[in-house]
Amino acid sequence: MSNNITIFGVGKLGVCFALNLERVGYSVLGVDIHPKYVDSINTKTLKSSEDSVESMLTLANNFTATTDVDQGLEFSNILFVLVATPSLDNGKYDHSQIDRLANQLIKRGRQETTKDLIIGCTTMPGYCDDLQDRLERYNYNVSYNPEFIAQGTVIRDQLYPDIVLIGSRNEESANKIKGVYERLVENTPVYSIMSPISAEICKIALNCFITTKIAFTNMIGDLATKVGGEPQSILDAIGADQRVGSKCTNYGYGYGGPCFPRDNRALGVYAKEQDCSIHISDATDECNADHLQFMIDNFEGDEVIVEGVTYKPQSMMIEESQQLAYAVGLAKKGVKVTLIDKPEVLSEVKSIYGDLFTYRD
């Protein structure tokens, strides 16, 4: 198998994947549409909030970037795609960046050598099969290989996955992807190989299972709090049962961030389209919202300090942050709220909420 790998889209996730691949001996070419960003990679001046990215880039000898799609195609027959697929207002994922790349590939005609196009971003179930139908005549094998990572620990999460999920119609393609990970990872993950649509369902369903567990945890915690019980003692006992497990059973803030909420909604939307309502998807979102309101309603006092308003520690993202939503809810009911976080985070919050809070870094 070739030692060269091309990655289309070297943003927060893609650049980490590129650096991890380079570290284990691959030559990696990143293709991105932003010239200044590409320059920052090639000049090793990229600034990143992800742990180890800047130091790994400084040491990397075989990772470069370009804006040239043709160069990316010529460099390797293994093409990973890690562009953004943000959520649309209807709850589905926006595939426009993948579609834009696919149209560019189609314009370049049929490839002499079969190329593996590996979609690593989250897609709606059925999308990769549709993409395969569009690209098959141009000699592409489309596979699906999403990553289960968390913002702030992407480098480590890619090296120590619990599961490597591969969706492919082609056994040879699936084995190529597996081979990349066998060289990359530093643990012994489960390799789950299935059809693309199965993998697409699996990706969002796995995250939805976690959101449901978090919502259930907080629901029981709220109930215990209301009747004078001991929330965490109850939850620790529940988590001690091996059928449940102790992960995600700490009573506290609900789920938020760029992945869990949108995956939960997307699964519900997709199921309804198939006339297979997954009521638990809607119920989980409702429980998450109810828990936030419970926390706000049960706060007693005139002032509070909220330390850390990103959706999770070691992240710079405030997207659907329950910590921030809690602070907003308290401030709107007259509580004096002081926020403590990194200057960059506070600057973003202040640009949205102005003088609603007192800010302290």
What are these regions (language model features)?
Residues 2-361:
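Structural/interface elements that position substrates and couple domains in central-metabolism enzymes
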